Amino acid sequence: MIRINQIKKSYGTHENRALILKGISTEIEDGDFVVILGASGSGKSTLLNVISGLEQPDSGSVTYDGTDITAFNDRELTAFRRENVGFIFQQYYLLPNLTVEKNVRMGADLAGNSDYRSVLKAVGLENKLKKYPGELSGGEQQRVAVARALAKRPRVLFLDEPTGALDEATGRQVLDYISRLQEEYRFTVVMVTHNLNIAEMANTVI
């Protein structure tokens, strides 16, 4: 279980500091599909970054089964993210000089997992292994990003507007892949979106 307790986060200089997260508390059960819903600038991505360990809060705690990651130093946070979480963002961040297979294998290698081909097959890319990112459509590139994140078998998958750069039909297809893979691999999903239709996929909305 992930417990978020009285998280506060602010940005800016001392004179012009803006409080973005104002004492947020919630719990996320293992295997939950959680959506952080809100308008642009409401602090959705900031909350995701704090929960995932990409940013530290000003105060409060984030615990994974009782372990408070806000007490970790940078080295410990890096190790925690490598071992426990996967990330998918609106931008794909694929390495253009590597094939689909090698991009995905990078995620598997981080976790010492050799079974990355099953994830490639699950997202319908088994026939694109030798293609390069520049040869793929936007939807296919995002599926590569999904496969790379899941190849390491993360405990929690964090997604920040993962379909924002895709048309509605392609975005829905990518989300369907994620939903099916979650059922198969039983990981927790925490996704940021402003889209009410996407939020309907979740069993918990923050």
Provide a role label for each language-model segment:
Residues 2-205:
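ABC family nucleotide-binding domain
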